Every structure is written in C-alpha cells, then in structure tokens.
Amino acid sequence: AREHALTAYEDTKETEDGFLHARSRAVLGRFYAKISDNDLALLHYSGALETLSKLDDPQSAVEVEMLLGQVLVDAGRREEAAEHYLSGLAVAEANDFRVLQGEILARLGEVEPDRSQRMNYLQRSLSLFRELGAVDRMREVQNSVHRAVMGK
C-alpha cells in the first residue's frame, strides 16, 4: 500500500493536475494515519488541503479537514482537531453538504470539552441525520449523546 501511494505521489508531483496530486497526498496521509505515524499523516493531509483550497474543491477540502481532525484527535491534540472540524463545518454549511455537516458535528461532539456545547453539536448532528434518514449514523450519535449525558 505504501509503495502504491508513494508511486502515485511521485507520478503526480510534477504534473499540472493539482487535484490528482492532492488526492495522492491524501492517500499517503491515510496510509500514515493507519500505521500511527501522525506527523507524516499531518504533513500529507495538510499539503492536500492546501492544494484543494486553491483548486476550489470544497467537498474534498471538507473531507481532508475531517481526516486532519481525526489524526489530531489520535495524537491527543483535541483543540487543534476542533479547529479543523470547525473550518470544515463552515465550508460544509456554505455549500449545503448536509451529510458532511452531520459527520463534522458528531466529531465536534466527541472533542468539545464543554458539556453544553458538546450536547449542542450532537443534537444538531442527530437532527441532520434524522432529516437525511441515516438511521445507522443516528444510532451512533445517540450513543454519543448518551455518553455526554452520563458525563463520559
């Protein structure tokens, strides 16, 4: 997997196709995240996000913000993760990416230290998933709400 990702990265580095290069960096970021090399994952996700922001590809940018946030959570950097989630949420809301909004709100509900704000994020996520008919995600968010209510 690593060799494939590195080959794609090298092959697209010198091309004019910024989107493909950004995607190859995101794939590398995902690889490094899976093997818990958070520094390299952050490096590649950040590079992908920078390129996608220039290309005006808001959906991909939101997805990479979420991936960056997850790597930061895994690294114990919850406050920084929340910043990426909030950036992604702003773009998702501006573009009416409702599924992504729900996902980001659920993630914010996991990292937010303030219990009241955590509940707010989770309730908003739950409402969006209910509107979208995403039953499985609703159950998962309901479990998060339960944990928040129980103070965990």
What are these regions, as identified by a protein language model?
Residues 6-17, 46-57, 86-97, 126-134:
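Amphipathic alpha-helical segments of tetratricopeptide repeats
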Residues 15, 28, 35, 55, ...:
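Structural motif corresponding to the intra-repeat A-B loop/turn of tetratricopeptide repeats
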Residues 34-39, 46, 56-86, 90-93:
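Alpha-helical adaptor scaffolds
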